[in-house]
Design a protein with these regions (language model features):
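Aromatic-rich peripheral "rim/lid" segments of glycoside hydrolase catalytic domains that contact
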Residues: 3-6, 12-38, 43, 47, ...
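Sparse, context-dependent recognition of short Cys/His-centered cofactor- or disulfide-binding micro-motifs
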Residues: 75, 80-82, 113, 156
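Aromatic- and acid-rich polysaccharide-binding/catalytic face
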Residues: 9, 15, 50-61, 78-108, ...
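Short, compositionally biased strand/turn segments
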Residues: 66-76, 145-150
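Surface-exposed cleft-lining segments at the edges of enzyme active sites
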Residues: 25-35, 63-70, 94-108
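Loop-centered beta-sheet repeat module
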Residues: 39, 55-63, 71-73
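Generic structural signal for well-ordered alpha-helical scaffold segments
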Residues: 1, 82-86, 159-160
């Protein structure tokens, strides 16, 4: 940050701070927590604001997209953290939702739950950025056309909710081409994952079309 400061228009100041059931405050154990206690987050944002007076300063978190017990608890803990930071006057501007979608969890995706969470975050005066969008496949042994359709449908369902909320200001995919997707080594099972807009030869897939339609609709209705 000392080098780039406000050249970057947003900063991920604190990444993935929440982990349920470990520490009493719901924070993830880390060297920062060990050194400074739970207020390390406050200190991080205050220092970041001094280095970047006009940039957007964000918390970034994963695993908060589905109606599953562990994700429901994580959303609640995250919302409590955001409320606490706002009450303390901490210079936080928003929340990054990583949105690493998982086709194995699609039966547990509830539009209303995501919409309510976005409303709760927005009501705190915070922005939301979809920061790491991609899709983990459940069954890469299916025909490619079926796989691509499932990925596109999952992204479409998610963006229909996210982009309808005024707090959501941007969407960033966690890569462009399947060739370089982290999910190709972390996938389930291992192998080339088709969860990004372009295939391994950089040809657009149905997910790219869904993104184009979603953004075009957003701008047309602005």
């Amino acid at each position: 940050m000392p080098r780039y400061g406000d050249v970057a228009f947003t900063w991920d100041v604190v990444n993935e701070p929440i982990e349920a059931g470990v520490l009493p405050d719901g924070l993830r154990p880390s060297p920062y927590h060990q050194a400074f206690g739970p207020d390390y987050i406050v200190r991080a944002f205050e220092d970041a604001r001094m280095l970047a007076p006009t940039a957007g300063l964000f918390v970034n978190e994963f695993g908060i997209d589905h109606d599953l017990p562990e994700e429901n608890e994580k959303r609640l803990l995250l919302l409590r953290l955001l409320e606490k930071l706002k009450k303390k006057g901490v210079p936080i501007d928003g929340l990054g939702i990583q949105a690493h979608l998982d086709l194995a969890k699609q039966p547990y995706f509830r539009e209303a739950i995501l919409a309510d969470f976005l409303n709760d975050v927005g009501s705190l005066g915070l922005q939301v950025r979809i920061s790491e969008l991609d899709v983990r496949e459940a069954n890469p042994l299916q025909p490619v056309a079926d796989r691509d359709t499932q990925v596109a449908q999952a992204v479409g369902r998610y963006l229909d909710v996210a982009l309808a909320n005024r707090a959501v200001g941007s969407v960033t995919c966690w890569g462009l081409s399947d060739r370089y997707s982290w999910l190709s080594s972390w996938g389930r099972p291992a192998g080339l994952n088709r969860g990004l807009p372009l295939d391994s030869d950089f040809n657009p897939k149905p997910m790219a079309n869904v993104l184009n339609i979603a953004f075009a609709s957003l701008f047309n209705n602005a």
